[in-house]
């Protein structure tokens, strides 16, 4: 559960940087 949240935040951060 905790890892799922961490991965979600990482994906959002990557997408934000990316864009």
Curated annotation (Swiss-Prot):
Induction: Stimulated by putrescine. Inhibited by aromatic diamidines berenil, pentamidine, propamidine, hydroxystilbamidine, by ethidium bromide and methylglyoxal. Keywords: Autocatalytic cleavage, Decarboxylase, Lyase, Polyamine biosynthesis, Pyruvate, S-adenosyl-L-methionine, Schiff base, Spermidine biosynthesis. One of its GO terms (biological process) is spermidine biosynthetic process. One of its GO terms (molecular function) is adenosylmethionine decarboxylase activity. Binds 1 pyruvoyl group covalently per subunit. It catalyses: S-adenosyl-L-methionine + H(+) = S-adenosyl 3-(methylsulfanyl)propylamine + CO2. S-adenosylmethionine decarboxylase is essential for the biosynthesis of spermine and spermidine. The alpha subunit contains the active site. Heterotetramer of two alpha and two beta chains. This is S-adenosylmethionine decarboxylase subunit alpha. It comes from Acanthamoeba castellanii (Amoeba).
């Amino acid at each position: 559960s905790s890892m799922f949240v961490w991965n979600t935040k990482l994906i959002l951060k990557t997408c934000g940087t990316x864009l």
